[in-house]
Amino acid sequence: MVQSVELVLDVTAEAEVRRQWALLREIGLHAPGPEHRPHITLAVASEIWPRLDKALARQEFRPFPIRLGGLLVFGARTPILVRAVVPSAPLIALQHRLFRVIEECPGIPANVRPDIWTPHVTLARRLRPGQLEAALDTVAWDKDFRATVEGVRRWDGDRRDEWPISGTERL
């Protein structure tokens, strides 16, 4: 499994992403369920050492505004549909700082390294041939929207557990 460092959004933005997830599930796509939380993944590793949580928490964090923009498609055989997060100076700086804390951990994929990372919120995974058009028809008409990054959390995919690192305690 994977472990990650993620950004969590304000309640209004979460509700908008959840609405889009529900629309995609209604047409039979693999969108996250209500038990999942919309987030922006900053860093991923096969293991993030527990001792690094304190170092992550020492990194300066203040809530900041972002904009969720257009749709992107990652992959070809089983595409992933995502909503782009428009890069901003605070977002890029935070990703660079937090990545530096975990960069020695094992199993870090290249696509989360600074200057390669594409900020996004996942809408649907494992799309089969023919489903991409339906997915786009369902959510492409949604306009860009503003959000606030309220906090940083850690996710442990092995234990299916999350905990706050900084910012909001609302998990």
Regions found by a protein language model. Name each.
Residues 68-74:
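A short, structured active-site edge motif that brings together acidic residues
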Residues 74-77, 150-164:
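Glycine-rich beta-strand-turn "strand-cap" elements at beta-sheet edges
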Residues 78-81, 85, 115:
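Charge-rich, low-complexity N-terminal segments
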